[in-house]
Design a protein with these regions (language model features):
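Conserved catalytic neighborhood of penicillin-recognizing serine enzymes
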Residues: 1-7
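Active-site beta-strand/loop architecture of penicillin-binding DD-peptidases
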Residues: 7-125
């Protein structure tokens, strides 16, 4: 079932790819080589007693390969806990980054998504 017009999809997909593939994007940890991943991050404050709390829900909705979409993967984490001892290995060759105080989708759900695609991508045979 097609949910959006093909012309709209053709306009949006390159933007979703840039979110993952460029240094200005917020989802570089999902830039798994050979799978042309695109996606959109989302970080939301959870409501509590009519106000917003400091608790987060982080989401990353991804599609791959963006040039000929076959799969979508949505990862949502409820109250993810950043780990100051965790070592993030960038996929673009930059030096690893140790520790994280950022509780945003770009540092939590995107990383999980990248790990999942890295493992299931070869099984799905979706390399472009």
């Amino acid at each position: 079932i097609r949910l959006i017009n093909q012309d709209v999809s053709n306009l949006i997909n390159p933007i979703l790819r840039k979110i993952v593939s460029t240094k200005e994007g917020t989802a570089g940890f999902a830039n798994v080589a050979g799978f042309e991943v695109g996606g959109k991050t989302g970080t939301a404050d959870q409501p509590a007693d009519g106000e917003y709390s400091k608790k987060k829900i982080n989401t990353f909705a991804s599609v791959f390969p963006v040039s000929n979409p076959k799969f979508t993967l949505v990862v949502m984490l409820d109250e993810p806990k950043p780990n100051k001892e965790f070592v993030y290995n960038y996929r673009d060759g930059r030096q690893p980054y140790k520790g994280n105080w950022r509780n945003t989708a770009g540092w939590t759900t995107v990383w999980v998504t990248g790990q999942i695609i890295d493992k299931i991508g070869p099984i799905l045979a979706t390399k472009y």
